[in-house]
């Protein structure tokens, strides 16, 4: 029993995170030097994400009996994403107005060092609904895979899957080749995931070493407010959605606990995308639903990022004594409904979207971003964890409404203690 616990990924990642915090606190410089370990692990995962999505989506769509089912799945998923993301934005707005974590700081925007956020501001200029939609279409198929753009790969995979389904028996050989290739890819993921504790250790040691636990105290009210709101959203909103669809949010969280720990260590929900594809299938969701909902959710269903965006924007207004009336806050909400869809599940993307939103709204001082630049990294964990849980719940809900969920299999998987899920495609 003790040997099984020690050898489990859950225990190893938890131990690695703890050691990372200790090293970063006691030896800050050495902790900051551990950054390549975390970056290297995330890059290894990113290396494999594009082929994983392609194989999963193509085999899922091509293997379906009816193409109408794919259209229905996509429509229900997008509707769900929009409704739940809007709820997340509204909850963030309500809590930050109620608790007012930035009130009383009386910061003069003119005294803030805006040079630190210049790089983010430049990236933010490229944000917008038209550029975002055009960016979904790759300049070339090879370019989509080379850049690792999830939505571009997803678009090509959907079209490829439709075409493969359309040619019927003629495409059987190609289908089998892609299916076999996916087994090789998931074998590679098995090898990479053994390095998860190393990646989590490096990322956590860097975070504590560079920013220090002391930096949490200065703006701790905003961090505490944000974490509390994320917990409120997970257990109240997602918990209610889960209960309405026949499962417990607590049991689901327990089911994906290894993935949650990896995300906690790396601050990137993208780092467990391949594992989530397999785990959601093992939970009873059809491959076609999982292949569409999970990757799409990484751009369109970022609940944690939505909460962060509203809270951070209003916090800046409160801290700099910038008055925002109800109409201006509603305008901010509408802009965020669009801009939040451009945030990918990687560390730092939420901050870029925040910069884009503040630039677009015009009511808030862009220099105010410097206030939260130092603590943004500490809030990225809660963002990523909330995003991951939200996408998992979304997959189960969409699968259920599309009659693509084996509910008996789901209840059995959630009732039993989480087992090690082998990453293959059998």
Swiss-Prot record:
Keywords: Cell inner membrane, Cell membrane, Membrane, Symport, Transmembrane, Transmembrane helix, Transport. InterPro entries: C4_dicarb_transport, Na-dicarboxylate_symporter, Na-dicarboxylate_symporter_CS, Na:dicarbo_symporter_sf. One of its GO terms (cellular component) is plasma membrane. It is found in: Cell inner membrane. Its main location: membrane. It is a multi-pass membrane protein. GO terms for biological process: L-aspartate transmembrane transport. The chain crosses the membrane at residues 5-25, 44-64, 76-96, 142-162, 184-206, 222-242, 307-327, 330-350, 352-372. One of its GO terms (molecular function) is fumarate transmembrane transporter activity. Belongs to the dicarboxylate/amino acid:cation symporter (DAACS) (TC 2.A.23) family. Responsible for the transport of dicarboxylates such as succinate, fumarate, and malate from the periplasm across the membrane. This is C4-dicarboxylate transport protein. It comes from Aeromonas hydrophila subsp. hydrophila (strain ATCC 7966 / DSM 30187 / BCRC 13018 / CCUG 14551 / JCM 1027 / KCTC 2358 / NCIMB 9240 / NCTC 8049). The gene is dctA.
